[in-house]
Amino acid sequence: MEVQRMQEFFGRRSLPERMLQQLMQTETRLRVAHESHLGYPYNLSFGPGLPVTLQRFLINNLGDPYAGSHYASDVCEMEREAIAWLMRLWGCYNLEDYWGSIGASGTEGSIWGIYLGREALPDAILLHSADAHYSIPKAARLQRIEACSLRSTPNGELDLTALAEKLVELKGRPVILALTCGTTMKGAHDDIAGAIAVLEAADYGPDRRYIHIDGALNAMVIPFLQDAPDGIRPMFDLGFDSISTSGHKMIGTPMPCGALVARKSHVARISRAISYLKSNDTTLMGSRNGHAVLAIWVRLFGHGYGLFANDATVAVDRAATLAKRLRTSGAEVLCNPHSLTVVFDEPEPEVVRKYQLACSGGLAHAIVMPSVTDDLLDQFSDDFQKGHRWRTQKA
């Protein structure tokens, strides 16, 4: 029956049975993996998704989404609509002053945001916290930008005292500052307003700094939380220059993708006309996945602000509840305020494998995304507590 189902799906272009069997095995493996996934910030609640008929088309958003191109099979209009949705979420009150695009991932957005900063300030040094995503120093290496990792607080935020000390040491040299809204391992939020206040106090005005926000996960969480402090809200009126987020994380697309929004003045600085495309070169990739654009568009407008707000509020509450449950075993557990990430000592290898936990430096975490079920949290809590009691008795 499964082979017949696959044959009906592929129709006249049916694949050999050997290949169909391999696809079915892959489908089964993925289904099982999704059911026990707890370690990475992927929202697996995709919803209805896109019509299968759209898979028949090569949809390529070439060049600048605001300029279009010679290629007619694009969805640039829907890309602009999706970006405008995000712009409003992040406080872009005059949309004409901002630019955005959808790319391969939040990492692509961070690389491009840092590139915009380098073009604005060619002699700048890139500053980031020790808890920043690995793609931030990678962006520096790719672009041959000098970078400096600053110490973090124990809960994973950028230490503002370390930032102030570094600015004194730099003696006025321009800086590109990468801040994080939801750090990779601990789900911490850098104090955006506090960091900008430190910059201002050191006489680093907008002409001597560029600030990028890596909001891969929580730039789609914090704006929806009514009790989140204004200082960690990724709103452009705080004074930063660009922000990126992932589509396959809180937004919930079935493929990796992401979005970048930046002040238009920075993009205008690097824009080049490309006659071959009848467009402008303003993006890192020349070809951008139109199917990813459609997936983000469907999620943003189909799910809507209200449901995203509910998802964020409920997920934060459930993460805090999970942390309390794990602490009942006597384990040390960190769950930052307004975070979906629950951090604990790395458990037994079988628990790591079963729940696909992300581990680093002796720590591991679970991330309570909207797609995580209560049953999965119950199973994980039981396994974690049994293992912790065993380790405690053995010690």
For each feature predicted by the language model, list its residue ranges:
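N-terminal entrance/gating region of PLP-dependent enzymes' catalytic architecture
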Residues: M1-E96, G362-A364
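Short acidic, glycine/serine/threonine-rich loops at helix termini
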Residues: W112-Y115, P137-L142, G187-D191, V221-Q226, ...
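Conserved beta-loop-alpha segment that forms the PLP phosphate-binding cup at the N-terminus of a helix
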Residues: C76-E79, I83, D97-P122, A139
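Active-site C-terminal subdomain of aminotransferase-like
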Residues: T183, A216, F224-H338
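Conserved C-terminal alpha-helix-loop-beta "cap" of PLP-dependent enzymes
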Residues: E27, P137, R272-L284, G304-A395
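PLP-dependent aminotransferase-class I/II
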Residues: G103-T107, D123-A124, H128-D131, P137-G194
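Catalytic PLP-binding core of fold-type I/II PLP enzymes
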Residues: H189-D227
